[in-house]
Amino acid sequence: MSIAVDHTLSDVVTRWLAAFEGALAAADGTALAALLAPDTHWRDLLALTWHITTVSGVQPVVDALLQHGAGTAAGSGANPAANPAARPTGCVIDLQRTPPRKVMRAGAPCIEAFFRFETSHLRAQGLLRLHPEAAAGGRHQAWTLLTAADEIKGYEEITGSRRPHGESYSREFQGPNWLDKRRAAVAYADHDPEVLVVGGGHAGLSIAARLRHLNVDTLIVDREARIGDNWRSRYHALTLHNQVQVNHLPYLPFPASWPTYIPKDKLANWFEAYVESLELNFWTRTEFVGGLYDDATGRWAVTLRLADGSSRTLRPRHVVMATGVSGIANVPELPVLKSFGGAVMHSSQYRDAAAWQGRDVMVIGTGTSGHDIAQDLHSNGAHVTLVQRSPTLVVNIEPAAQLPYAVYSEGIATEDCDTIAASLPLALARQSHRLMALQAAAMDQQLIADLTRKGFRIDTADVYGWQFKYLTRGGGYYFNVGCSNLIVEGKVGLKQFSDIEAFNAQGACLRGGDQVPADLVVLATGYQGMDVLVRQLFGEAIAKRTGPVWGIDEARQELRNMWQPTGQPGLWFIAGSFAQCRIYSKFLALQIKARQVGLIA
């Protein structure tokens, strides 16, 4: 969709950018402060700080900009420690992006504009939001400012005009051809990868593709037998719960004919095609056993268990953990189950609903997996009871659950949507999601009332909605794709775990004396955090040095240890949604490349 250029807005933005660049060149803190609104926020994605960081408030933002992005000229607030190499120059509206426009963000009107600039080492992009009304003196002030690295000068992605020529294998008829070279590259018979990516899901593929395009030698290892099996092996009816336009992988978008909600097997097959098309190095049936870091050499010694049972040691400089927000199954000790005579499995082990046709199944846990498994079992003829342990947020998959992705339906390029998504600082993201949570509750008022009447406990304590539940705990919500309706209609039973006194050989004994029969109990009890996996694979010392992974660091206003250096050199993490991994894989890859070429020690 083409958006007409509003020349008045463009003039406002151009004047602000010129004043901003001039104030930084002069290291003039007073002039900078005049450009910022009292409620201002600056988020930097490597462009000026080589970090992912957010700063809020006029004086903190001024101080940070002077520290990282000011020139060395004398001026009001001149900072002798300023780094002229990071000073933005050539700040102009990016004519290749969505033109400046008036929009609503976090419930407030603003002027939103994409711009581009350079530093000594980087080409970069930015997103500016100005309050729509001019302040005293007629100058518009910045509400939010995003600065984000795009590419390292001299080390650009090998795409387009920089694509490989192919001469080495197309004109040397007696030498190895393309396939020979690919096989040798994947084998690592005589060298180690620069980067080892652990996990071949969307997170691992995203970072490996980014690094491949930066000419960084990267190997993905995954314990599954086939690329995509992390999706292919899940329960039969699974589809993605957000829409196709949000879920593209880097460089290779899904075809325009694909369904809105992608089936698991279709996605799994796409993963295989993606690896082949982008020439990603991938070892299947390979388990990452653990790793030790050598501070003297700056390399890891990682142990891999191969398909034939043998071990292989590799020595990469970087290990990227791409095993997901949820890694190790959380199997709680439930004493009441000790006397149960039937089968018990964790939701991660659940595969085949048809095997339980006509039989009684109890699913413990009311998050997404619990609901989906209950619905899958019911659809295949099982008699299902869902057991709730704690209050759960429920939203209809359409339209309420899709509200956080509304920007991807504004008719603008995915790249622009990604920049907008990355530009909201934590405070405004919370405000935005609080408003969306209220809107979703209004949309789903009837569903919530019906579930409450059936005895389902709705989580109303968290006012920021499902996405902040994901960012803080990785779950605790359900997108209703039909199971809630089955509960309301009485087709799927509902019990509270607190009402279960004990289990016997036949099922659950309730405190009131009733019996709920069960041949199978599925524990949809979630997963342990990545901290547990780090401790298991790398040991206590490295886990302690690394620190907590995932969840929000309130002081920094960022996710903890995601997409950026951790306390352990050479250990990185990437996780989250398809959109998060598409967006932040770029910045993780740039940080690794900058270290490889010596821009960062």
Locate the predicted segments by residue:
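Flavin (primarily FAD) cofactor-binding/catalytic cores of flavoenzymes
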Residues: 148, 160, 216, 221-223, ...
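A solvent-exposed, acidic/Ser-Thr-rich amphipathic alpha-helical stretch
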Residues: 12, 22, 26-79, 83-107
